[in-house]
Design a protein with these regions (language model features):
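Selected alpha-helical membrane-embedding segments in polytopic membrane proteins
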Residues: 2-83
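Transmembrane alpha-helical segments of integral membrane proteins
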Residues: 3, 126-142
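Hydrophobic alpha-helical transmembrane segments in multi-pass integral membrane proteins
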Residues: 35-42, 104-112, 158-173
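Helix-adjacent hinge/juxtasegments
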Residues: 79-108
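Membrane-interface helix caps and helix-loop-helix hairpins in membrane proteins
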Residues: 86-87, 109-117, 140-144
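Cytoplasmic-side transmembrane-helix entry/capping segments in multi-pass membrane proteins
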Residues: 88-98, 123, 146-155
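Transmembrane helix-loop-helix
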Residues: 108-131
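Terminal transmembrane helical module of multi-pass membrane proteins
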Residues: 136-173
Length: 173
């Protein structure tokens, strides 16, 4: 390992000492849209909105998938950051992050064309969250608090995706 590498590793460790609590707050607040969509579906309404149907009404399944793609995009960006600011970055991270987001985007477009694709989109998004976590675990240089939070959030998001899939089953209705 060169002196440049050891200095870089030291800055990685040093940065982890300053874990910003906003990460925790924003991370858990980010679960709310997933939970809202599940609650609307669980209630049997299958649409957001308290106004008459003349106004914009959002399908909670489509809302769930679009929000999922947005969050996957944010998380995939962390692999890009590692490429430039961490000694653990590699080209595989760039390719993997792009593949996850593009796959999720294709699933979203397919869902918007025909809702018959929505279960596939929810499944691929769930797998995307798990793949990103697995890849991030190999290169994660941040502190234990962040790692625990990241694992918990990914578990909860994957669980919510599974619940969405269960709610989509014909027997659930």
């Amino acid at each position: 390992m060169s002196s440049k590498d050891s200095a870089h590793d030291e800055s990685d460790r040093e940065a982890s000492k300053y874990f910003n609590p906003a990460f925790m707050v924003l991370g858990y607040l980010g679960l709310i849209p997933f939970a809202m969509a599940l609650l609307v579906i669980f209630s049997g309404k299958y649409e957001f909105g308290y106004l008459s149907s003349e106004y914009i009404v959002v399908d909670p399944q489509v809302f769930f998938v679009t929000y999922s793609v947005a969050i996957l995009s944010f998380l995939a960006g962390t692999l890009w950051q590692q490429q430039f600011f961490s000694s653990h970055g590699c080209e595989k991270n760039l390719v993997l992050s792009n593949a996850v987001v593009v796959t999720a985007w294709v699933g979203l477009v397919a869902t918007l064309v025909s809702k018959a694709w929505i279960q596939i989109a929810v499944t691929t998004n769930m797998l995307g969250f798990l793949v990103l976590l697995a890849r991030e675990r190999k290169a994660m240089v941040l502190d234990l608090t962040y790692r625990k939070m990241r694992h918990r959030l990914t578990f909860l998001v994957a669980l919510m995706h599974l619940l969405m899939l269960v709610f989509m089953l014909p027997l659930s209705r």
